[in-house]
């Protein structure tokens, strides 16, 4: 690549300049923030609650721990972690998108969750936290939207304490051909129509379907985590691999 030539990346199936992707992703989430929780329930038939509950169960969160809920959006995981870490613990709900962060803050405060939760607008590629700060980091359905995933994983590793755990919950690749066919049909034909009906925004849900297909598969993401410095990395497929939970440790 010659000097001055723009580097490119993907935004769904489109090729865009690297410095434009964050702005485009921001536009998607500004558009859907107000109806994000409703769409999650509708498009996953409520199964996202099971995926998130399993993530919480394997997190090992205990009273007094510091947890970073990265790309935490409307705060589903933060709400659970707040209860688990208690008054002596701390949960940081971080998201690059201020619209999502505002929805999350309002939702949690309306539930009376205020004492041990703070809110930070942050870019996963350059987290504004000290080294070795958190016991647990989660990023649920957010990594695929990050422009430089390798940089983000290294940043997470930096702010995680030795002995700490990273949990990456993300859409992945179905394991069986019949499921792949059904999933593709649903994603590209049904999902955008749901988006249009509920949020008046079909394009954002077309991007969702495309971004899932462009995201690294289970084994590729596992190796990316290893390359970023995580150890004992493994993953669990859920719903035939439509979603996978990756786990890695910092020692």
Curated annotation (Swiss-Prot):
Entry-linked Pfam families: Ubie_methyltran
Signal peptide stretch: none
Function comment: Methyltransferase required for the conversion of demethylmenaquinol (DMKH2) to menaquinol (MKH2) and the conversion of 2-polyprenyl-6-methoxy-1,4-benzoquinol (DDMQH2) to 2-polyprenyl-3-methyl-6-methoxy-1,4-benzoquinol (DMQH2).
Any Gene Ontology biological process: menaquinone biosynthetic process
Native species: Shewanella baltica (strain OS223)
Name of the protein: Ubiquinone/menaquinone biosynthesis C-methyltransferase UbiE
Key words, A-Z: Menaquinone biosynthesis, Methyltransferase, S-adenosyl-L-methionine, Transferase, Ubiquinone biosynthesis
InterPro entries per UniProt: SAM-dependent_MTases_sf, UbiE/COQ5_MeTrFase, UbiE/COQ5_MeTrFase_CS
């Amino acid at each position: 690549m010659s000097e001055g030539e723009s580097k490119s990346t993907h935004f769904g199936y489109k090729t865009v300049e690297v410095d434009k992707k964050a702005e485009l992703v921001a536009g998607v989430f500004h558009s859907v923030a107000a109806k994000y929780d409703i769409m999650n329930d509708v498009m996953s038939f409520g199964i996202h609650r099971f995926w998130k509950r399993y993530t919480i169960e394997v997190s090992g969160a205990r009273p007094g721990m510091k947890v970073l809920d990265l790309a935490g959006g409307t705060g589903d995981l933060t709400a659970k972690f707040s209860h688990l870490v208690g008054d002596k613990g701390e949960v940081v709900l971080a998201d690059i998108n201020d619209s999502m962060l505002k929805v999350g803050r309002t939702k949690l405060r309306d539930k009376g969750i205020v004492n041990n939760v703070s809110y930070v607008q942050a870019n996963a590629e350059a987290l504004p936290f000290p080294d070795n700060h958190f016991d647990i980091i989660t990023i649920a359905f957010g990594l695929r939207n990050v422009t430089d995933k390798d940089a983000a994983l290294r940043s997470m590793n930096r702010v995680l304490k030795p002995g700490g755990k990273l949990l990456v919950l993300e859409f992945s690749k179905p394991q069986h051909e019949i499921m792949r066919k059904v999933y593709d049909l649903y994603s590209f034909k049904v999902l955008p129509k749901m988006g249009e009906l509920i949020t008046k925004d079909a394009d954002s849900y077309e991007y969702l379907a495309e971004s899932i297909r462009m995201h690294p598969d289970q084994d590729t993401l596992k190796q990316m985590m290893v390359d970023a410095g995580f150890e004992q990395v493994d993953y669990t497929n859920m719903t035939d691999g439509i979603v996978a939970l990756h786990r890695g440790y910092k020692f």
